[in-house]
Amino acid sequence: MSLEKGLINSKIIKDHGLTKSEYKLILKILKRKPNLLELGIFSVMWSEHCSYKSTKKWLKTLPTSGEYVICGPGENAGIIDIGGNDAIVFKMESHNHPSFIEPYQGAATGVGGIMRDVFTMGARPIANLNSLRFGDISNNKTKNLLQGVVKGIGDYGNCVGIPTVGGECSFHKSYNNNILVNAMCVGLVKKNKIFYSKAKGIGNPIIYVGSKTGRDGIHGATMASAEFDDNSIDQRPQVQVGDPFMEKLLLESCQELMKEDAIIAIQDMGAAGLTSSSFEMASKGNCGVKLFLNEVPCRESKMTPYEMMLSETQERMLMVIKPDKKQVTFDIFKKWGLDAKEVGYLTDTGKMQMYFNNNLVGELPIKPLADSAPEYDRPRKKKESKTIKVRKRKLKIKNVFLKMISSPNHSSKEWLFRQYDNMVMCDTIFSSEESDAAIIRIHNSKKAVAISCDCNPVYCNSDPKLGAKLAVAE
């Protein structure tokens, strides 16, 4: 068996979003030239979206531990102890680029992705929130983006049956070509029923479950790391397509399997799909993986190993299970009508070995891709605080008031909020429409959780540090 060969040139390297220095590092790591499949895997794993190579330096400075922190950065979602045997699992994530290119699907899959991150930890989602920024509302492009994003968020959350209880939306011309779509999900879990993504147990089977793999979203992580403009419409095939009804089946089936003491590790196939989920689980467990790509359920014919590994088809999970629990695992997923296949097993090699048609088509060391992406300290200069100069002039209070309330930022957002079901599950005491924060009750207790999602971009633009402080304070 030999690795599949393919010509790699400077154009292909650039098209994969890799720099010359990064490619030289790849050659140093492998001690040989990569084939196209391997280059594609480096591309997505070392993308800004997956590796945080430009922001990791700064993210490391944030406080991440505390008396009530059960799980900080590094897992699918954060976990906070709320007393007794209860904990809150939460995740907030941006889906800006996909939503700019294809607003409905971009926003919908943003919601779906964070919900999977939350229930992967063993939690049941109890609330969704969002924070949205759009350009000049008089711009037709902005109107189309607003309508698509809001409908995508509402349709996905409503169909899965999770209340969207809060959020915010504002407009400014600076967002004309760079909208922000931040989705948040909150879930409830028992502290003794938390699941993690650390793979362990040499020889343990790796199970794929969920939607069949298609060609949608290939290089979505790389696309999400690039700059874009009005010509980005050509990138629509890289935007994932969501299926909220499949998400509901996946949620309920995973919750059922979690009661069977079958799961050793579980990971959502999010950005970079099968690649990121398999590499991340193996890296955390310091083990290797053998993947048999012929076993991957595909919905399109003649899919290549490159397409299977880089597809970002939504509503998919990868898990390592106990060998004696394979039958109960397949029985549960069959009951829910889901595709579930054994696609590989754990090894002690520290390498990802990918086979297709009985041939070894790719072999890569796991740690350098999952944990050792290049980190950058980008050039920067201190930004002077901006102050708004107010000219002295005679103003009529009535005119000032009318101008303020005529701004779309101060207008009623009822049209937007009414597209979100905030009472499904019947646990919403208050939505943020009714108070400064949404309040969700916790079953079988006298506890409730207050949730808010706010930020003032004017403050952040004027003074980023002070603006960030005020966002936390708010």
Q: What residue ranges belong to the model's regions?
A:
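Glycine/proline-enriched, intrinsically flexible loops and inter-domain linkers
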Residues: 1-474
